[in-house]
Amino acid sequence: EKADTLSATFDWHAADRSWEFKATPYYTRVADYIDAIQWNGTTNAPRAAAQTNQFTVLKFMNQSARLYGLDLSGRMPLAKTGLGEFGLKGLLNYTNGRNRDTGDGLYNIMPLNARLALTQKFVGWDNALEFVMVKGKHSGSDARNEMDTPGYGLVNLRASHSWKQVRLDFGIENLFDRLYYH
């Protein structure tokens, strides 16, 4: 694969970097992208009409693809109290990918997703309550019969304690044990 990418990062922040916001749009064209096409085993040729919602043989082929998207990130302080420094951190990601030869969506592209974390720093402790939100996926790879998946939200809890040369991390991912699909 050979990829050509155009991207730029725009960075706004306070002079002391106490808060910041970054935006990174990007566009990528890929030559010889390894993608799958539906293959007819009987005729040993590409399928004339795509089979959907059933098993089909796939063959990997070098094709042309394009991806574009936007990554946003930011952080800001909320308060300094007797219980430490509180802040917010966030990420938002959008990616769109298409096979330029077939017009099909690229396989396994993450839908619009975001993370928002409430953070606390206090006497060696670094804690976070994180919310993860993912939009439903409704435009995947038709050639691979990629299934639609519903959107979901998760809550993660993390804590770490640091000493001079050692850090101990704890975490509970998916705190409420919610069923979700990637």
What role is predicted for each listed range?
Residues 25-30, 47-139:
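Gram-negative outer-membrane beta-barrel transporters
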Residues 9-13, 24, 73-77, 117-121, ...:
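Transmembrane beta-barrel domains of outer membrane proteins
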Residues 1, 33-40, 95-107, 138-146, ...:
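Outer-membrane beta-barrel translocator domains and adjoining extracellular loop/strand segments
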